[in-house]
């Protein structure tokens, strides 16, 4: 009887460790590394009341199939501000935006976060933990859409993120609009 209890306990511990280790490994936070890129207004431009920002990351930048449970962006701001945002992630075969109106519909993406984000004064990494993890397939490119619904401007035109250069070049992987 004692041997059976110990055996059952051992099986329970082994199954629990397999479950929890699989769960931990499958949930990743993707760091959006713009260290070699310009200081720009995306993914949020605190100088405006509303905004929509989309960027495409290639499969080679994102890597193999996994669950993505959050994002981090490098921020450089002159003061602390809070924004009301939504974040969508999606798969796409697009490699860039061919025109300034070539947005990928958020209806074809997964809403992963809806809430507020606080951006602290100074240079720092700003993390967002998703409400729902996104299952990245490891094959397609990844599109990230960030919508700012704050409704008032808070900030300075000098507040910036490290991100892909926003330009009109043929390989432009970032698209945005602010009002």
Model-derived segments and spans:
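Aromatic- and Gly/Pro-enriched, solvent-exposed loop/edge beta-strand patches characteristic
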Residues: 77, 83-168
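Short beta-strands within extracellular/lumenal beta-sheet-rich domains
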Residues: 48-63, 125-127
